[in-house]
Each structure stands twice: as C-alpha cells, then as structure tokens.
A protein has these predicted regions:
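N-terminal cationic amphipathic segment used for targeting or macromolecule association
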Residues: 77, 103, 129, 155, ...
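Solvent-exposed loop and capping/linker segments of extracellular ligand-binding repeat ectodomains
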Residues: 1-239
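A short, polar beta-strand/turn micro-motif
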Residues: 7, 12-54, 60, 234-260, ...
C-alpha cells in the first residue's frame, strides 16, 4: 500500500534469459508476470528496463515478453514508454487489455513487426480517445488482430500505411468501436481473412479514405462499412490568405463526386491561354485528368457510382502511379508567376496526378500558358 503521490520503481538486474517468463522458450499463457493494482496509478519510465537493466536495447528479447503485463488494470491512467523498434511474436499481446482508465496510448515506434505482436493490446480500453501512430508498412499475420476491439472512445483510426496485407493482420482491429467514423487505408487490394470483421459495429456513417485502385463496391464489416463514404484524399497548395488551393487529379478506375467546397476543371488550350472548364454535373469520370480548386489544403473526393462522359478535348493527361514526366511535360505548380503549369524537366509526380504535355514551349521559370477559369 502506497500513500498518494508515492512511487515504486522496478528494474531488471539480470539478463532477459535469466528472468523466468522472459526466456526464449516461454510460450505465454496463464503463467506470466502481471501487475495488479488499485487506485489511480500512473506508469512511467521505459518498459524495457524490465528486461535490460541498462535500457540500451531496442529489440524485444523473446516471444510473449510483455504479454498481459497490465491486463485488467482498470485504474491505470498512463502507460510506460515502449521504445522497442524490433518486436517478437505476441510480445505486446493483451498488454493493456481492459485498462478502462487509460486515456492516452504510448508511442509505438516499431517498423519491424512480428506475428500477433499487437494482438488485443488495447482491447476494451474504453477511455482511449486517440490511437497511437502505426508506422510499419510491412504487415505480418495477426499483427493488429483485435488491437482496438471495443475502444468506444475512438472516433478516428490511425493511418494505415501498409500497401499490402497479410492474413488476419487487421482482423477485428476496430470491431465494436461504436464511435469510429474515419479510417485512412493505403492498401490497394482486399485479401481473404486480412480484414475479417475489422469494422463490425462502428458508427453507422463515416468516411473511408483509400487509394483509387481499391475496390470500393465491396461493402460490409470486412470491407467498407455500409453507410460509409469511400473517398480519395486530396492535398493542395496555395495561399491561406486567399483560401484558394490548387492541385491536379487523375481519377483512374473510379468516378468521383466533386463536393461543394471544390471545383474540378478540364483544360483546353486557346492560343496562349489554357481555359479551364468545370466538369459536367460535378462528376469526375473514370480516367479523367483535372485541375482541382479547393477551399482548403486537404479535402476529400467521394467515390460515386454516378456516370459521366470524359471530355473529348481535354489537354490534360494523367497517371495512376508515380511517374517521371518527359523533358517537355508541364506540371501544376505555384511558381514565380503564380499558379500555372511549369516545365517539369523530367521530375517525378505522384500517383493519380495530372500533367500537361505541351512539347517544351516555355522555359522552366515561365508558365507555359496563362490560366483562365470558366465558372
């Protein structure tokens, strides 16, 4: 029993292999070290001090290393630092499960994951209001399985940067997160079992941000939830004082509805002027290249099943993948002469971007053509 404000310190004085339960042969289960606490408790310091007295290693030494360490500690209000960047199988499994007073999760810097490393880590942490960043781009089996199950305080998911999935990697990840209404994913193809029930029981309406290449017509608790809007994230450049931001977009395989705070234009060259005309019916057809004028630097283009016809005389071309432009191609930029298309000198542009092939009619510091907007 400690008085209010008092502290107790824990540190390992032996190697990880000398500590029962942290050995390389330990397989988890019921016989594991676990804190039991009452009263409001704040954990601090580096959890690696439990396996390394000098806190020099950033590699988890064994499987199940911190399995269930704070499980059912309903009075835990803050978590210790988790500095490891190389993980082992099941190392953080159930670590904070049912820590219902935990408001903020620790940072998770690891980029090399292991099987089930984060499985059920924050499951039923109902006070958690913000999920930690998940920087890893290579998934492994079960790595995030039920990681945030029933975290009812979450409204948005952490960005999911992985472009390819692994079996059960996101299975049940946000299941029963009843207030979750925003997910941003980077993968371009659904995979069997990878997302089983991952968005079961989330908010009835929400936004699912994803690449153009992902199949958006498949809906359900293991894909995009019914009632949610699939959208493409747009980042634009401009001047905040005018609230005018510009970028280009190539719609690839899907059609998109232009929201009210944005205008999409196709382009036709008239002498020294590039005339920009709004797309018909506010729909960017599949395969169309456009200039976007936005009211803010970041916004979303909702996917639509509506149909529209591509412009027959659009001077803009587009690319679905990151590409290097030709020596005489032009890209939209905020250059010395303002917003316009400037010679890009063979530099790359990102995926789903548009460009202007004009054949080198102006130097790099000069706009190829003046721009006029037809409203």
């Amino acid at each position: 029993m400690l008085d209010v404000g008092r502290r107790v310190y824990f540190r390992n004085t032996r190697t990880a292999d000398e500590v029962p339960g942290f050995s390389k042969d330990y397989k988890g289960g019921y016989n594991h070290y676990q804190f039991v606490m009452r009263g409001k408790i704040s954990a601090s310091g580096n959890v690696m001090s439990l396996v390394d007295s000098d806190v020099e290693t950033t590699t988890i030494p064994s499987e199940y290393c911190f399995y269930g360490l704070f499980e059912d500690c309903t009075s835990l209000i803050s978590a210790p630092e988790l500095s490891a960047d190389v993980l082992k199988g099941n190392c953080y499994k159930n670590m904070f499960k049912r820590c219902t007073s935990l408001v903020k999760a620790p940072e998770l810097p690891a980029t090399r994951l292991a099987e089930s490393c984060y499985e059920s880590m924050f499951s039923m942490c109902t006070s958690l209001s913000e999920a930690p960043a998940l920087p890893a781009t290579t998934m492994v089996e079960d790595c995030y399985n039920q990681m945030f199950y029933e975290c009812t305080g979450l409204k948005s998911a952490p960005a999911l940067p992985a472009e390819k999935l692994a079996e059960y990697c996101y299975s049940g990840m946000f299941k029963s997160c009843t207030n979750l209404n925003l997910v941003k994913a980077s993968f371009t193809e659904w995979m069997d079992y990878a997302t089983d029930n991952w968005l079961d029981g989330v908010a009835k309406e929400g936004t699912f941000i994803c690449p153009d290449a992902l199949d958006k017509a498949t809906t359900g608790t293991g894909n995009i939830p019914e009632g949610w809007t699939a959208a493409f994230e747009v980042k634009a450049n401009g001047k905040p004082e005018t609230h005018d931001y510009y970028t280009t977009f190539h719609s690839g395989k899907n059609a998109y509805q232009v929201p009210g705070d944005m205008t999409a234009y196709t382009a036709v060259a008239h002498g020294s002027i590039l005339l920009l005309t709004p797309v018909a019916n506010g729909i960017i057809p599949a395969g169309e290249a456009v200039v976007l004028k936005c009211a803010q630097s970041m916004c979303y283009l909702p996917y639509t099943t509506g149909t529209a016809t591509k412009s027959s005389n659009n001077a803009l071309k587009g690319t679905d993948k990151s590409a290097t432009l030709g020596a005489n191609d032009y890209a939209l930029s905020l250059g010395q002469e303002g917003v316009g298309f400037y010679l890009w000198n063979g530099k790359p542009i990102g995926a789903n971007k548009a460009y202007l092939p004009l054949g080198g009619i102006a130097p790099a510091t000069t706009k190829a053509l003046g721009i006029e907007f037809e409203d």
